[in-house]
Amino acid sequence: MDPARIDAEFPAPSYRGAQEAALDRIREAFEAGNDVVLVRAPTGSGKSLLARAIAGCARRAGEAEPHQPVGAYYTTPQVSQLDDVAADSLLDDLSIIRGKSNYDCILPGESNTPVDEAPCARERGFDCPVEHRCPYFSDRAIASNRSIAAMTLAYFMRTAGSDVFGRRDVVVVDEAHGLAEWAEMYATIELTPGRVPTAVWETTPPPAVNGLRDATAYAERLAAASDRRLTELRAKAELEREEVAERDRLTELIRELGWFVEDLRDEDSTTTWVVDQPDGAGTAVVIKPMDPARYLHHTVWDRGARFALLSATILDKAAFCRASGLNPADVALVDVPHTFPVERRPLYDTTRGKMTYEHRDETVPEVARLIVRLMANHPDEKGLVHAHSYAIAERLRDHLDRFGVGSRVRSHDSESRDAALSAWKRSSGADVFVSVRMEEALDLEGDRCRWQVLCKAPYPNTRDSRVARRLADDQWGWYYRSALRTVIQACGRVVRAPHDYRGTHPAGSSRPGPFERARPDMPGWVADPVAPPAAPGPPALGPDAALGGDHSDDPGGGGGAGGRSDRGGSSSGRFDRSGSDTQDPSDHPLSDVWGE
C-alpha cells in the first residue's frame, strides 16, 4: 500500500467539508504502520469518496513481487449502498459483482431464470455455449481482474477461500459499525423446517436440546443425514429447480454445521455459542455465536493486508476491536468533524411516554397525536416515522386512520418494504412513511424527507438469547451503545447536505437513556444537537392542516405501495365527529384547532 497516493486517488474534482483534512489524517495513520484504520465520519462527509481514495492506494500489479497481494476490495453490508455506488459516476471504476440470483440466464427459453437456477446449475456436466457472455460470470471475471472489486459484505464473506477472489492488498469496509453483528447473523445456524430441506428434517427431527452438548450431537447427526441426501441429488443427471435449491442449501448447511462443531471443539476459539429451542423436542433449534472473532478472521481479516473501516457510529474503539477480534495496538481511529450547522439538524425533546410493551397501550395513541401535529406543521413536506417493529407500525396506522389522516400515510410489510420505500421516495407529494428497521443506508436528501419521528429508543431485544447473555455478563455499555448507534444512524438519514434542514423527534420517554448512559462514547457532533428545545406546539391551522391539500401524485394517495388509505377515517380525511368513532372528540389531536 502506498498511502502517499491518497490525494491523487480522490475521485472528485474538489474537496468538500473536511474531506481534505480527513485524507491527510488517514494517510498519516497508515504511514504510522497501523494495519487497520477506523474512520469515524458523519453523514454527508462523503465516506464513499474517502473509501475510493483509500482503495486507490493499494499495491499495483507492476509494483508487486509474485507473493505479494495487489488491488483492493470495497464492501458494504447494505445492498442499497452498493446500488448508490453503482449509480455514482465518480465511482465508475469500481467493478461491481453481485450474487448469482441477481442475474438472469441468457440461454434461449431461460430469460426469466436466475443464474443460480439455470441449466448450468441443474444439469450435471452442462457445458454452457455462452458462458463467456453470461452476465454473472462476465461481471465476476471483470471484478476479479480489476484493481477495485466492489460487492456486498455477504458476498465477500461467502467467497472466503475462493480462488477467484483471493487475498488483496487493501480491504475497505463501508458502514462497518455493525461488522461483528453482521458476522453473528451470517454465522447463525437456523435448524427449522423452512431452512432444513424436508427430506432431511422429517428423517432427522430435533430432539430436546438442552445445551451445547445436545446441540453438538444433533449437529453431527444432521450433517450426516444432509450428506446422504446431497449424495443422492448429485447422482442425478438433471435436477428440477426445487432440487437445485435443496442441493445448494444442503451444501451450505453441511458447511455451517461443520464450522460450528469445529469451532466449539477448538480450545483456542474465543467464540461463545448459545442455543435456543423454546418449544421443545421436534421444533426449531437456533445456534448463535457471540463475538465471532474466528469467523471474522476467516471471512474478513485473512482477505487483506491493510484495512479501512468507515462508519459514523464506531463509538468505542476498544469495544469494537474486542468484538471484531482486532488488536487495538494495530488499530488507529480517525475522527472526521461534522461540517453541517447544528441548527440545521436539531433533535427535539418530544417524548410522549414509555414504549415498553406494558405501556404501549397508553403511549402509542400519544405518539400518533404527535405525528398528526407534525403533519400539520409540515403540510407540504414528507415525513418518516421509525416504528421499530411491525406491531407498533400497525397500531400507529390504526390510530392515524382513526384520526382521519390515513390518506397521507404509507407503510409496508416485510415483503413490500423495498417497493413501498421506492414508491414513497419517487412521489412528489407530502406523504408520511411509517417504516420498520430503515435507520440505515437511506439517502433522503432534499425534499425526499423533511422531518422524522423515532417512536422508541432502539434498544436490542432482551428476549434474544445473545442479548440476554451479554446483559447477564454485565455488558450494559454494549447495550446502550447499540441503541445510541441506531439513533445516530436514523438522524443521518435525513440531513444529507449542509443546506438541508431536518428535525428529528424522539417519541419514547426512554430516549434520554442511550444519550446519557453512552455519553462518554458520543462524538461531539452527535452531542451538539442533543439539546432540549421546546417541542413545537400545535399549529393554529384549520382541521385540514395535517392533510396539507394535494399530498400525493399517486391516484390512490396513501394507498400507494404499502399504503392502506381504504382503512379507518372517512373518505374526506377528516375526523368523524358524528359519533362513529368511539374516541372523545375533545381528545383528538386537532381538537384545539376546532375549539372543542
Features from the language model and the residues they span:
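Conserved RecA-like ASCE ATPase "motif II neighborhood" in helicase/translocase motors
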Residues: D127-D169, V434-E439
